[in-house]
Amino acid sequence: MSRAQSSPTVIQWVIDTHPLWPSALKTKDLTSAASRALSLLTEEEQSSVLRYYHVRDAKLALASALLKRYAISRFCHVPWFQAKTTRDSRTKPVFVLPSGDEPLIFNVSHQAGLAVFLAVRDPPKGLAVGVDVVCPSERRDRDLSSLEEDGWASFVDIHADVFGAGEVSALKSMNPVPTVQGRDRALRYFYALWCLREAYVKMTGDALLASWLKDLEMHKFAPPEDMKEAQEVRLRGKKVEGVDVRLMPLLEEYMVSTAIRNGDNGERVELGEFQSLDMEEILAFGEKASKP
């Protein structure tokens, strides 16, 4: 079946790296504890993984690299070590065939031990994806301490340069009561907004220093438990059409946002649930797909 006749396939994966390679207490320990996984990467990729100071970051980098190779090799039917990503003109990782086609578009995000992968196989022309994951509890103690010392308005001001003016006003208007419960709820709104914006920006492929970032607004943003309707995105005050931006809970402590831009002719793809992926499945596939 030719690509033109193929229907798009949405891929939504998540890997929890916390239980992986438990004997690796330092990054250098991965050379033995994760030798099987590392052997499925090029020397350049291995060096990129092992340069991280914290082993938790190295494990996430390793899982992310394997996720991308697995998806490309499996869904594009290419040998494992030919499943290489390059960077486009905006430095976004892509997989491009010699013909110039992109049979798989994808985006990866990782935070607090979790790697999240969103991709579309055989995407219609113009379709784009972005994904971001946040873990509000990861910085909870530090955030609560900051709120106790400096207050909510000051906390928002510290991060105001990465949000739109309307978003800053919306955050400040929350003015949470000075209780742990009230501050926790406000922080969930803060991280929900952060996650939504990141996914959208990653979808566009533009850098975080894009000139339009201050003109971007997630209108009436909310964490998953308070989100009543589809997320509306505005740019310079006007609603952005043809983009589906969502926020959903993941496991117990995470939120994940997906941003999908319709194809040039309005084609849409349907999201499902994120599926937990077993590292053994990736390694077994990689070993088989890397054999001559």
Curated annotation (Swiss-Prot):
**Under which name does UniProt file this protein?**
4'-phosphopantetheinyl transferase 1
Q: What happens when the gene is disrupted?
A: Leads to lysine auxotrophy. Impairs the production of the gamma-pyrones fusapyrone (FPY) and deoxyfusapyrone (dFPY).
Family statement drawn from the similarity comment of this UniProt entry: Belongs to the P-Pant transferase superfamily.
EC annotation from Swiss-Prot or TrEMBL: 2.7.8.7
MF annotations from Gene Ontology:
holo-[acyl-carrier-protein] synthase activity; magnesium ion binding
Note the superkingdom of the native organism.
Eukaryota
Provide this UniProt record's keywords sorted from A to Z: Transferase
Q: Return the SUPFAM superfamilies for the record.
A: 4'-phosphopantetheinyl transferase
* Function according to Swiss-Prot or TrEMBL: Transfers the 4'-phosphopantetheine moiety from coenzyme A to a Ser of an acyl-carrier-protein. The enzyme is able to transfer the cofactor to a broad range of enzymes with acyl- or peptidyl-carrier protein domains. Required for primary biological processes such as growth and asexual/sexual development, and activates target enzymes involved in the synthesis of metabolites such as fatty acids, nonribosomal peptides and polyketides such as the gamma-pyrones fusapyrone (FPY) and deoxyfusapyrone (dFPY).
Q: Which reaction does it catalyse?
A: apo-[ACP] + CoA = holo-[ACP] + adenosine 3',5'-bisphosphate + H(+)
UniProt organism field: Fusarium mangiferae
Which taxonomic lineage does the organism of this UniProt entry have? Eukaryota, Fungi, Dikarya, Ascomycota, Pezizomycotina
Give me any GO biological process, just one. lysine biosynthetic process via aminoadipic acid
EC main group: transferase
Instruction: State a GO cellular component annotated for this protein.
Output: cytosol
